[in-house]
Amino acid sequence: MTDLRHIDCWVFDLDNTLYAAECRLFDEIDARMTAYIKERLAIAHHDARTLQKDYYVRYGTTMAGLMREHGVEPDHFLDYVHDIDLSPISENVALANAINALPGRKYIYTNGSVAHAENVAGALGIFHLFDDVFDIKAADYTPK
């Protein structure tokens, strides 16, 4: 195994990285983004979906487009889209042991919110292993 003792800082992406994409949590977030746009802008589902993808391409995140084009308050958007069912994931002892064995500080970096990171990493049984979360708000809403 490679000697990792010289590394003093680890940064982990959250969604579809600390848990398998097959859990489909991000699919639920994606669907909630469309629903949010549909409700907020009072437009048809198809139009909301098209706008969601357009904003993602043009602004780097759907939220950035909504903030710029419609004055959407980001915390409200993040709370709404991250209100998801976490039952597809469960405590991952092997992942916890692997992260715990790494030397140095450990951080979660996410385009989501701190609350979302706490909820997901908590469900995985690993949140306590991290020193902090760097979320989209800490990044001044600039996506990774």
What function would you assign to each model-found segment?
Residues R49-T50, R105-I108:
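Short, charged, low-hydrophobicity "junction" segments
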Residues G71, L102-K106, I126:
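Short glycine/proline-enriched coil/turn segments at helix->beta-strand junctions
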Residues D3-F12, T17-A96, A115:
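N-terminal helical cap/lid subdomain that shapes the substrate entry/recognition surface
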Residues A101, N111-G112:
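Glycine-rich active-site/cofactor-binding loop and its immediate structural neighborhood
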Residues A21, I108-Y109:
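Small/polar loops that bind or transfer phosphate-bearing groups
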Residues M1-R5, N119-G122:
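Short amphipathic alpha-helices and their capping/turn segments at secondary-structure boundaries
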Residues Y107, V114-K144:
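Substrate-recognition "cap/lid" segment bordering the active-site pocket of phosphatases
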